[in-house]
Amino acid sequence: MSATQNYGTGRRKTATARVFLRPGTGKISINNRELDNFFGRETARMVVRQPLELTETAEKFDIYVTVLGGGVSGQAGAIRHGITRALISYDESLRSPLRKAGFVTRDAREVERKKVGLRKARKRPQYSKR
């Protein structure tokens, strides 16, 4: 491993992303696929690019990501969290603007479990008075 590499782990819902930041030209590779090929939705691609655009480092790094678990939205959020952490390990002064934007904090919301006697987590069977 080269010393010029920065690493960050990101998590969101059940998705986990391992992000490697290397000096480069702005190429983003996720599970050995280009960003545009990996995410079909523009919103997911936008979420991934947010920390880079905020810190104006989009053209400074090549980003290599391995992401596991979750769905499209969860994986995009996990990658964003990982990129944020990797940027902070690269330059601690970036923490303040990233925190203001809300990218540093791990989104702790998880799916609520289904309860016995209920159809879903909170949906109850229809109540009959008589």
UniProtKB/Swiss-Prot annotation:
Record keyword 4Fe-4S present: no
PANTHER family, sorted: RIBOSOMAL PROTEIN S9 (PTHR21569), SMALL RIBOSOMAL SUBUNIT PROTEIN US9M (PTHR21569:SF1)
Top-level taxon in the UniProt lineage: Bacteria
Entry keyword set: Ribonucleoprotein, Ribosomal protein
Source species: Stutzerimonas stutzeri (strain A1501) (Pseudomonas stutzeri)
UniProt keyword Ribonucleoprotein present: yes
HAMAP family found in the cross-reference section: Ribosomal_uS9_B
InterPro entries, per the entry: Ribosomal_Su5_D2-typ_SF, Ribosomal_uS9, Ribosomal_uS9_bac/plastid, Ribosomal_uS9_CS, Ribsml_uS5_D2-typ_fold_subgr
GO cellular component: cytosolic small ribosomal subunit
Pfam families: Ribosomal_S9
Protein family per UniProt: Belongs to the universal ribosomal protein uS9 family.
UniProt GO molecular function: RNA binding; structural constituent of ribosome
Name of this chain's protein: Small ribosomal subunit protein uS9
Any one of the GO BP annotations: translation
